[in-house]
A protein has these predicted regions:
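Terminal amphipathic alpha-helical/low-complexity segments used for targeting or macromolecular assembly
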Residues: 1-60, 168-169
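Left-handed beta-helix
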Residues: 60, 65-66, 71-72, 77-86, ...
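Catalytic-pocket segment enriched in acidic/His residues
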Residues: 109
């Protein structure tokens, strides 16, 4: 647990102490509860695991299914509105911003959520959907929608905004 608290503190210049990070940041609280819920899920205590996940979502605004596999030192920055699905796998040293969805596109009881490599950054509001793989060290820009595999070291961005008119009529 100390490892992911240190990851937050080293990432966020506004964090003044590990105590502040643990008690006042929603990401570490969601991840702490997820570790417990994931263990319960792995020993087939599904209801209790889902109950813990629901409590976490209520407290933090971050929804992580207890079946999701999360690597070391994940940083969920701000976090409100993040959704991480049941069969999602996230590697080590990743950063996820608020409003991100790691979601499925099918309802079959198979692998239906993304696999995220190590050292991946996923920007605000990005949607990564389906049983795809995001390669190590990739960066996904804000509000991007990704539905195909990305090789390692990829950078993907959503279409940029452009001014259509300078006056409102």
């Amino acid at each position: 647990m100390l490892e992911f608290l240190r990851a937050y503190k080293s990432y966020d210049p506004a964090a003044k102490s590990l105590i502040e990070v643990f008690f006042l940041y929603p990401g570490p609280r969601a991840l702490f509860i997820h570790r417990t819920a994931h263990f319960l899920y792995s020993i087939r205590l599904f209801f209790i695991a889902r109950l813990l996940a629901d409590i976490s979502r209520t407290i933090t605004g971050i929804e992580i299914h207890p079946g999701a596999q999360i690597g070391r030192r994940l940083v969920i920055d701000h976090g409100v509105g993040c959704v991480i699905g049941e069969t999602a796998i996230i590697g080590d040293d990743c950063i996820i911003f608020h409003g991100v969805t790691l979601g499925g596109v099918k309802f079959d009881p198979v692998k239906r959520h993304p696999t995220i490599g190590n050292n991946v950054l996923i920007g605000t509001g990005a949607k990564v959907l389906g049983p795809i793989t995001i390669g190590d060290r990739s960066k996904i820009g804000a509000n991007s929608v990704v539905m195909k595999d990305l090789p390692p070291d990829s950078v993907i961005v959503a279409a940029r905004s452009e001014i259509l008119s300078k006056t409102i009529q």
